[in-house]
Amino acid sequence: MRVYFILILAVATVSGATSEMLSFQNAIQSSGGAKIETSAGRLLRAELTTDETYPEERTSLAAVEKLNAKTKDVLKDKWDAANVKYQSPFIYNDGIGQSIMKRNIDPDKVFKYLTQQKLDRTIGENPQYGLWKAYLELWKKNHPRWKSKLQTVD
């Protein structure tokens, strides 16, 4: 939930800054132009663009792309977790299990999303374990060569 709040806050900040910049757009003047009186007391000058690139600029672009990729991975993981938790009461229904399977979420991730911290067969099956077991059988039927990375799974 914090991620969504931060994302909404960032969008609101950017949109506020953009609308403020648009209000001062009439104060832009080229370098060789005549003097313009502004009511805001600010005057922005537009300079000719050059082909020069600065190393700091290129470094920041790489960092932004890296951050973008990591953010997409985290958001996809959170979205998949929310999707599995939302549909977990319906995994017994084969159609819902197939819809989760279309997202290529393997049973190890489903196990993690259902907040099963460890696989303990001595306690007995709780509802989340039953859901995970049903999904595991469905996954193995469609992916016979798949091997689980969990230690105690057959």
Curated annotation (Swiss-Prot):
Alphabetized UniProt keyword annotations: Host cytoplasm, Host nucleus, Secreted, Signal, Virulence
GO cellular component: extracellular region; host cell cytoplasm; host cell nucleus
Location of the protein in the cell: Secreted; Host nucleus; Host cytoplasm
Motif RxLR-dEER: chain residues: 42-58
Upregulating conditions: Expression is induced during host plant infection.
Signal sequence coordinates: 1-16
Main location: secreted
Cell wall biogenesis/degradation keyword on record: no
Known function: Effector that enhances P.infestans colonization of Nicotiana benthamiana leaves.
Family indicated by similarity: Belongs to the RxLR effector family.
Entry domain remark: The RxLR-dEER motif acts to carry the protein into the host cell cytoplasm through binding to cell surface phosphatidylinositol-3-phosphate.
Record-given protein name: RxLR effector protein PITG_12737
Species classification: Eukaryota, Sar, Stramenopiles, Oomycota, Peronosporales
